[in-house]
Design a protein with these regions (language model features):
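Positively charged, amphipathic and often flexible ligand-engagement surfaces
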Residues: 1-245
Length: 245
């Protein structure tokens, strides 16, 4: 698997990085068992380097299946794996509550797939409000679990990974974390490579952790084009933010 080789490359380069994967990449479309077998191979490789794997969330048709696989990994003793939760889904608050019970590390994003109104908030203001609620839950969860921080080599993240380029969402998280007493290095902001580098640099200057999401492998361009095609709003987001470097 190319993903397994990615860990060798990260280690050889000495970069502060871990790996995110989509379960559709590793056999979920064939069967849950095939996917789980491949995922364990990846996690064992990550463990050999004391590294971490983040399972990306895809469209809502496989949300529950993705969470079930994460739970199966937990039952098998894997603790170097985390998940992504999408704020635009109605179910996300309940999912985060359960994930925090097991101290999972959670990346929170708004959500980029087109979903029906009975599954996801159709209005952006509602998505934003839910993002803030979910971010507060993760910050509180980090406090409850002893404020675990990023590992010294940057491979293992803290519990809250707040993936957003929205300054209002970032400001909310900063203010809320300070209010409840979560240290700056007990959460991280996450952004796409090349998007709002000015904001990334400013956050680092302020003492916050910033992780940059970099597509890798030979199929990065088709992946990028699919993400734009999945939802027309993605194109406007990319163009408007790319030129605000």
């Amino acid at each position: 698997l190319d993903i397994v080789q990615a860990f060798d490359a990260i280690e050889a380069a000495g970069v502060r990085a871990n790996v995110s994967i989509k379960l559709s990449q590793i056999g979920l479309g064939l069967s849950g068992d095939v996917c789980l077998e491949n995922l364990e191979l990846i996690l064992n490789k990550a463990h050999s380097y004391n590294s971490f794997v983040r399972i990306d969330m895809e469209d809502s048709a496989i949300t529950q299946q993705t969470l079930d696989i994460l739970e199966a990994l937990c039952q098998r003793g894997y603790n170097n794996v985390g998940i992504v939760i999408q704020a635009y889904l109605y179910r996300s608050e309940a999912d985060i509550r359960k994930l925090l019970e097991d101290c999972f590390k959670v990346r929170l994003c708004k959500g980029a797939y087109k979903e029906p109104a009975n599954i996801a908030y159709p209005k952006m203001r509602d998505v934003d409000n839910n993002y803030d609620r979910c971010a507060a839950m993760l910050i509180n969860g980090a406090l409850t679990n002893g404020c675990p921080k990023e590992s010294a080599d940057g491979k293992i993240p803290p519990i809250p990974g707040l993936a957003t380029h929205d300054p209002k969402r970032i400001d909310f998280a900063k203010v809320y974390a300070e209010k409840v007493g979560l240290p700056k290095d007990a959460m991280e902001f996450q952004m796409l490579n090349g998007i709002r580098r000015d904001l990334q640099e400013q956050l680092v200057k302020e003492g916050y952790l910033v992780r940059v999401y970099v597509p890798y492998g030979t199929e990065w361009y088709p992946y990028f084009m699919r993400r734009l095609a999945e939802r027309p709003a993605n194109l406007w987001f990319f163009v408007s933010n790319f030129f605000r470097k």
